Amino acid sequence: MQIITCKAVVCWAAGEPPVVEEILVEPPRSGEVRIKILFASLCHTDVLACKGFPTPMFPRVLGHEGVGVVECVGEGVSELREGDVVIPTYLGECGECENCESGRTNLCRTYPLQAFTGLMPDGSSRMSSAKGGEMLYQFLSCSTWSEYTVIDANYAVKIDSRIPLPHASFLSCGFTTGFGATWKEAKLQEGSSTVAVLGLGAVGLGAVEGARVQGVTQIIGIDINDNKREKGEAFGMTHFINPKKDNNKSISELVKELTKGQGVDVCFECTGVPDLVNEALESTKIGTGNMIMLGAGTQKSMTINFVSLLGCRTFKYSVFGGVKVQSDLPLIIQKCLNKEIQKIEQLLTHQVQLEDINRAFELLKEPDCVKVLITL
């Protein structure tokens, strides 16, 4: 196994536009795999990454959504082999630690969330600049905006290759986060639960689709972009609120108007905007309401309205929608193949080559944009 020279998207400092340049990708070490990325996609978290989220470690190779094939495996890897189609992720699952066995969380203690170091689990990087040899941090330890990447084998999920690979890229973070939150976190009741989804991007549409699959009959979508109405309805949304069209009422007031003054059982906050968190919480029922936050932002803190909490509502943050990468993600792929999850192809609105990555960031601002597919 040799060092590979390939193209990747590198951000050299917070606030600087990313650039496509040649990097060096080392062979996998023990317990690791090297993946040839075929498709990647753009998530709002990647925008935040250019600003230093979740920690300002630069230079970094961007990207955390993608799908590819195993190019080679390191010593001790038995579950994967060359040619396997895989999704690289930022979570692991050992199946044996206290958290994995509890059934209450998807955050494995043995293979933890790789969000804060920018390095492999052993504390080093497999990527460096082809120009000056500088070490490059790996965003969320997977860096999918690179023709090749190296990750710990436990963070790579082998998937059924029958699924269209662009769709698999969409399932590697955003859509699955929303869908998983309805399935793994919310404990929705078929025919009785009411749901609101704040923000109808890929995460929000995943939550809408998940609520539909769970049998929810009232699914309220909330977005300031009217173009999202049609997309939300395609995934199962039953009501739509554009808060900008009724400036005299808050989001929670508008939600309660649609729920006989009660609010919803569960509100999924998919924007990461701190000012909307309290509105999402206040949109839920007193005593039993549950607000699940899925969005991310650059702010380090937020203020929660204590009065809303006095109503005995529950507030929880969810990473990857509570989905366990090895146990649950293959099941979501299967749900797509058997058409239990429908219309996932409608997430795709734009497509660019890796060399046009900065155009992808501009496309994300378009009112009709949901997912930008990146072809490598």
Swiss-Prot record:
EC category:
oxidoreductase
Q: Which residues bind Zn(2+) 1?
A: C43, T45, H64, C173
A Pfam family per the record: ADH_N
| Reported cofactor(s) | Zn(2+)
Q: Which GO terms describe its cellular component?
A: cytosol
**GO terms of molecular function:** S-(hydroxymethyl)glutathione dehydrogenase [NAD(P)+] activity; zinc ion binding
Coiled-coil stretches: none
The UniProt keyword set, sorted, is: Alkaloid metabolism, Metal-binding, NAD, Oxidoreductase, Zinc
A biological-process GO annotation: formaldehyde catabolic process
What positions does the entry give for NAD(+) binding? T45, G199, L200, G201, A202, V203, G204, D223, K228, L294, G295, A296, F320, K371
Provide the assembly information.
Homodimer.
UniProt cross-references to PANTHER family, sorted A to Z: ALCOHOL DEHYDROGENASE, ALCOHOL DEHYDROGENASE-RELATED
Biological function = May be a positive catalyzer of strictosidine production by assisting secologanin biosynthesis, thus being involved in monoterpene indole alkaloids accumulation.
The entry assigns this protein to a family as follows: Belongs to the zinc-containing alcohol dehydrogenase family. Class-III subfamily.
State the protein's name: CYP enzymes assisting alcohol dehydrogenase
Organism (species): Catharanthus roseus (Madagascar periwinkle)
Instruction: Give the taxonomic lineage as stored in the record.
Output: Eukaryota, Viridiplantae, Streptophyta, Embryophyta, Tracheophyta
